[in-house]
């Protein structure tokens, strides 16, 4: 019997229970889930400010995708390195949460100094015992030499 995959909206409700889901959000998260599953190979989202676009695409989506595939390499770029790092830190906090560990026990990151040999900064975090990582960069920054499977561009201007 095939195990049913956790939907993106169910994931979001578990790790961010304070979010409210309007019909717009339900549709938006269904589209993001289709992207995460590869049914939509490339996606551009354009909605007015303060509609939860960044929470969905630059915070929850990378955490969800790393849970589904701990070997995935994801980069987030934004207009400033500071904002991109903020997204990265939010994803790291989700991955550290008890709720996330219950959903995706294979996807873990360095805590404190343990284990050694793994990177964890506000701009880069590696998944323990996997190839996956999350890198963040401002639009003036560089990703040269970094292979990525998913590139999320959020608020470039």
Locations of the language-model features?
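N-terminal accessory segments
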Residues: 1-41
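Residue-level signal for alpha-helix termini/capping positions
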Residues: 33-37, 67-70, 144
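Residue-level preference for the first positions of well-ordered beta-strands
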Residues: 42-44, 73-75, 133, 150
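Conserved P-loop
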Residues: 45-103
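SF2 helicase motor core recognition
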Residues: 53-54, 138-149
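Conserved nucleotide-state-sensing and coupling region of NTP-binding domains
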Residues: 77-140
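Walker B catalytic acidic pair
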Residues: 155-156
């Amino acid at each position: 019997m095939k195990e049913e995959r956790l939907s993106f909206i169910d994931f979001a409700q578990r790790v961010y229970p304070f979010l409210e889901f309007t019909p717009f959000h339900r549709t938006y998260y269904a589209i993001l889930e289709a992207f995460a599953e590869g049914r939509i190979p490339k996606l551009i989202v354009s909605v007015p400010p303060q509609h939860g676009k960044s929470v969905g695409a630059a915070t929850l989506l990378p955490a969800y995708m790393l849970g589904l595939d701990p070997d995935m390499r994801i980069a987030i770029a934004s207009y400033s390195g500071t904002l991109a790092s903020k997204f990265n830190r939010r994803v790291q906090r989700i991955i550290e949460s008890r709720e996330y560990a219950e959903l995706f026990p294979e996807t873990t990151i360095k805590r404190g100094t343990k284990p050694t040999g793994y990177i964890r900064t506000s701009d880069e975090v590696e998944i323990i015992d996997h190839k996956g990582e999350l890198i963040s960069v401002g639009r003036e920054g560089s990703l040269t030499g970094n292979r990525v499977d998913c590139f999320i561009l959020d608020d470039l201007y």
